[in-house]
Design a protein with these regions (language model features):
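Periplasmic-binding protein-like
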Residues: 144-153, 236-260, 314-316, 354, ...
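Conserved C-terminal helix/tail region of periplasmic/extracytoplasmic solute-binding proteins
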Residues: 334-367
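Secondary-structure end/capping motifs
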Residues: 264-346
């Protein structure tokens, strides 16, 4: 009997120890298994409160990448400077766009790139305006008025006047403002287009051909005219004429055009581009010396050549351009140019300027 009692007591003691261990383990399990809050329990009569876990910091917001606009520029004071200043002064960043600038030397290839969807906005000279009139690009801003297109003849060619171009070979990038001046000169000299052997060349080819004496004359524009003068010497050149010879009947606006599809699908990006362009345009006019230096660095065109180009340009402040848009002046400029394109066969008829001139984005940006 006493043995049974002793056995029972021993058994009871073992059970008490086991229960005590289970309670301790249970308390520990509760402490370690709670997430995001304070967990407490007792083990051996002691408080085992666990500090609350620190709340997770919100994930840092990744900066959104700015939308990109593919812009065709030309390496001169007109076609490059707004892009240069827009980047240098942060105007494009302020407007909320990124620019992918693509270099071109004349307008027609730019329109081809727009048709292929590779270019959204482009700078063009007056000579490519007929492509806008054909519906291939909407004019959204007038960069400036150009007086820098010229027709040069070599002294050894014997050409002294427009009429002397008969039977001569002229290098000209067709579809450009240089060709427009050539055509006006041919008409002024009492000749017909077929009287002159006008050879289509790219800009570099036309300059090289003239310098090498492979053509009798060249129809080109600043700053390439300056390069010709440096290589050949002014004494070996006969200047037949430039834009000013045909003022005020004809004015030669240089333009910024937009791919019609891009304008339709992303008008807000066109407005953002113009918001930056307007600032760059007005800064260029007021700070021409700094502008020349920055543009020369970007384009690798000598400063002297850009200075010559400045002298053959009539600038238009952005607010003044608003007036020209509203009073119909801009429309008249382009419709008048169309008459030349009809004469030389680039267009079959003069179409209304408001079918390809789109001032709405500009007027929305400049109040």
């Amino acid at each position: 009997m006493s043995m049974l009692i002793r056995a029972g007591k021993k058994s009871f003691g073992v059970w008490m120890i086991a229960i005590s261990l289970l309670l301790t383990l249970s308390a520990c399990g509760t402490s370690g298994g709670t997430n995001g809050g304070a967990a407490s329990g007792t083990a051996g009569g002691k408080d085992t409160t666990v500090p609350a876990a620190k709340p997770q910091e919100p994930a840092k917001e990744v900066p959104k990448e700015l939308p990109t606009i593919n812009v065709a520029y030309m390496p001169d004071i007109h076609g490059a400077t707004p892009i240069v200043l827009g980047e240098e002064k942060g105007y494009f960043k302020e407007a909320g766009v990124k620019i992918n600038a693509v270099k071109f030397l004349s307008g027609p290839p730019e329109f081809q790139a727009m048709a292929a969807g590779d270019i959204d906005i482009a700078y063009i000279g007056p000579g490519a305006t007929f492509l806008s009139a054909q519906g291939k690009g909407n004019i959204i801003a007038v960069d400036s008025l150009n007086t820098g297109d010229m027709v040069y003849a070599t002294k050894k060619s014997g050409i002294k006047d427009w009429k002397d171009l008969k039977g001569k070979t002229v290098g000209v990038p067709k579809g450009t403002s240089g060709e427009m001046i050539l055509n006006l000169g041919i008409k002024k000299g009492g000749l017909k287009p077929e009287d002159v052997n006008a050879v289509n060349m790219d800009v570099a080819g036309a300059v090289s051909a003239f310098v090498a004496g492979k053509v009798d004359a060249v129809a080109i524009w600043s700053p390439y005219t300056s390069e010709i003068e440096k290589q050949v010497g002014k004494d070996n050149i006969v200047k037949l004429g430039d834009n000013k010879m045909f003022f005020p009947e004809y004015v030669f606006p240089q333009s910024w055009v937009v791919n019609p599809k891009f304008l339709k699908e992303k008008p807000e990006l066109v407005e953002k581009f113009l918001a930056a362009w307007v600032k760059a345009n007005d800064y260029r006019i007021k700070n021409i010396e700094e502008t020349i230096k920055l543009t020369a660095k970007y384009t690798q065109v000598p400063e002297d050549s850009l200075k010559v180009q400045v002298d053959t340009t009539e600038w238009i402040e952005s607010k003044k351009q608003v007036d020209y848009f509203k009073d119909g002046t801009v429309i008249k400029w382009y419709e008048n140019l169309e008459k030349l394109f009809v004469e030389n066969g680039k267009l079959t008829e003069v179409v209304k300027g408001d079918t390809f001139v789109s001032p709405a984005p500009f007027l929305k940006v400049v109040k």
